From Swiss-Prot:
This is Signal peptidase complex subunit 1. The keyword Protein transport does not apply. It comes from Arabidopsis thaliana. The keyword Metal-binding does not apply. InterPro entries: Spc1/SPCS1 (IPR009542). It is found in: Endoplasmic reticulum membrane.
C-alpha cells in the first residue's frame, strides 16, 4: 500500500464509521431498539474492516519509485553529527 493509499484508507475509515454510527443512532432511536442500533453499527464496523484492511489494488495506484543501487551510491548518505549531551541542573 502506498502513502496515498494509506491516506485514502484513513479517510474511508473515518467516513464509513461516522456514517454507520449516525445511521445506527437514527434507526435505533426511531425503532427504540438498542439491539438494532448495535447491530447496525457492528455491521458498519465489519463493512469498514472489509473495505480498509485488505490491501486492495486501488490502494496501490501510486507506487514508490526507488533509486537503483548504482544511483543511490552516487548520493552519499548524510553524516551523523554527534551533539554533546547537556546536563540539566536543578535549582536547589
Amino acid at each position: 500500500m502506498d502513502w496515498q493509499g494509506q491516506k485514502l484508507v484513513e479517510q474511508l475509515m473515518q467516513i464509513l464509521l461516522v456514517i454507520s454510527g449516525v445511521v445506527a443512532v437514527v434507526v435505533g432511536y426511531t425503532t427504540e431498539s438498542f439491539r438494532t442500533m448495535m447491530l447496525i453499527y457492528a455491521g458498519g464496523v465489519v463493512l469498514t474492516t472489509l473495505v480498509t484492511v485488505p490491501n486492495w489494488p486501488f490502494y496501490n495506484l501510486h507506487p514508490l519509485k526507488w533509486l537503483d543501487p548504482s544511483e543511490a551510491e552516487k548520493h552519499p548518505k548524510p553524516e551523523v553529527v554527534s551533539v554533546a549531551s547537556k546536563k540539566k541542573f536543578s535549582k536547589k
